[in-house]
């Protein structure tokens, strides 16, 4: 299954007269837009293909459901008032757009050299990124939204799975609620994990549905983390970054891991 074939399969499943499809061969993406609203979603095809090799039709079913939910929701009018408990931060790569297709600035903060924090209104099966127009219409200021979002992400349950490889311990947060990567902003949780770690603490957010925390004891641990992060990055529906981060004194610093060597970016 290559990108062109996957593109055709998704188009066949989503065939509707009121939607348009644009395959970008260079970026390896498929954009689906509503003809009326001009709003839509962009799918990273390599991630879907990687999942297809493991899950076959289930991987396509998942992305089709995601697109249908997202585009159908775009016809609805959404408000922030009364929805305070549904506002969350989401982590995205620095290549992610900073404005909507209509040129409206999105609300975001710089996070690391590899990531940004955007703010979203949770809609159940999907979400809407908060933009400046939405804020102005409801007379909400940036700080109010950011404060609420940070509080809400700290309130999310955190279920951690553990795996050991060659003396190194890897912890995974993978609840698939759309905010696993966002839990990297839960500072009390990171501080709690830091107390458990006896080696070097590293973090990774390869895609939106996983947070990896590593207790690195030797060079093998760095190699395993790099391979693991790249694998998750390649298979994620919403990829973020294939780089990992050292966690020191509450700060995140991107690192390159090459073979048995690593260096700070």
UniProtKB/Swiss-Prot annotation:
Pfam family, one: DUF1444
InterPro entries: DUF1444
Family per record: Belongs to the UPF0354 family.
Name the UniProt record assigns to this protein: UPF0354 protein GWCH70_2742
Organism whose genome encodes this protein: Geobacillus sp. (strain WCH70)
